[in-house]
Curated annotation (Swiss-Prot):
The protein's assembly and partners: Homodimer.
Function (record text): Catalyzes the reversible cyclization of carbamoyl aspartate to dihydroorotate.
Name of the protein in question: Dihydroorotase
UniProt superkingdom: Bacteria
Length: 344
């Protein structure tokens, strides 16, 4: 039995940091474990220009704890009106590493998202031309489609036409949750990758209803059946270079999670690598964690691997029940419970 695991310092390829006082409270959790992170642009207002991304990046760097080595990899929010010129400027910046596709209304702060991807054809052509990755929230928002089917329908109605029309466009299918998505990414032609969250590796949709409604397990895309969880575990632990770590850690104040109309998102930045270690250990695949967490992501994005390391030890510890979040608190996933791995 392995009691200590040292890996190349990992990166988080899907992260929400928020802004203001909340940003200052959460960014240190990520920077403690990860060398870099892809920063989601769904602020209010959304980050749609290079100038906005530069300003947000500066706020992130200013909020880091003293002595921290961490690089925020910025993204832009794709809208119906994003122009090819915006893409070229972003690529030339050197600090913007992707453009995020949110179907309008799909998740938190996605109201300004794309209503019809066909409106973005010239912009997608520019992205393909300059090598700018498209980061996709892969769910349709048609209210007639069952919420548990929205990812599979997205593959058929959006992803397949997108790949046909822009075969050289680098696409990241973010936070995949289904067997369909795992198989699609594994078998697709061209530059396609996928991030997988710790919570989708560890839990199925039953976790939402154990003894009552469990709002801190509510995220989008929602947790799926056990057959889908097992398929995600198989993909993550396969060693296939198209699958890599993306926490989708999404902090929300306790009051808006424990609410009649609660927000979607699980906060895992505080204990991300500990959760992934549990998932990989449960699958008897700790030897595959380094590739998934530290190697596949930078290789896909064409970035150098980190020079440092992260060590995890087998050690029981209790996760805080709540942590500060601006003027309020937030509840991390499994808050107050025991974990069996600890990053040092």
């Amino acid at each position: 039995m392995t009691d200590t695991l040292t890996i190349v310092r990992p990166d988080d390829w899907h992260l929400h940091l928020r802004d203001g006082d909340a940003l200052a409270d959460v960014v240190g959790d990520t920077a403690r474990q990860f060398g870099r992170a892809i920063i989601m642009p769904n602020l209010k207002p959304p980050v749609t220009t290079t100038a906005q991304a530069r300003a947000y990046r500066e706020r992130i760097l200013a909020a880091l704890p003293a002595g921290t080595q961490f690089e925020p990899l910025m993204t832009l929010y794709l809208t119906d009106n994003t122009s090819p010129e915006v893409i070229r400027e972003a690529r030339a910046s050197g600090f913007i590493h992707g453009v995020k596709l949110y179907p309008a209304g799909a998740t938190t702060n996605s109201d300004a998202g794309v209503t019809d991807l066909r409106r973005c054809a010239k912009t997608l052509e520019a992205m393909q031309e300059v090598g700018m990755p498209l980061l996709v929230h892969g769910e349709v928002t048609d209210p007639t489609v069952d919420i548990f089917d929205r990812e599979a329908v997205f593959i058929d109605t959006v992803m397949l036409p997108l790949r046909r029309d822009f075969p050289a466009l680098k696409v990241v299918f973010e936070h995949i949750t289904t067997k369909h998505a795992a198989e699609y990414v594994r078998d697709a032609e061209g530059p396609v990758g996928a991030t997988i969250t710790a919570h989708h590796l560890l839990y199925n949709r039953n976790a939402l209803f154990v003894g009552g409604i469990r709002p801190h397990y509510y995220c989008l895309p929602v947790l799926k059946r056990e057959t889908h969880r097992l398929a995600l575990v198989a993909a993550a632990t396969s060693g296939h270079p198209r699958f890599f770590l993306g926490t989708d850690s999404a902090p929300h104040a306790k009051g808006v999670k424990e609410h009649a109309c609660g927000c979607a998102g699980c906060y895992t930045a505080l204990h991300a690598m500990e959760l992934y270690a549990e998932a990989f250990e449960d699958a008897n695949a700790l030897d595959k964690l380094e590739g998934f967490a530290s190697l596949h992501g930078p290789d896909f994005y064409g970035l150098p691997r980190n020079a440092g390391t992260l060590t995890l030890t087998r050690s029981q510890w209790q996760l805080p029940a709540e942590v500060p979040f601006g003027e309020q608190t937030l509840v991390p996933l499994r808050g107050g419970e025991m974990l069996r791995w600890k990053s040092v």
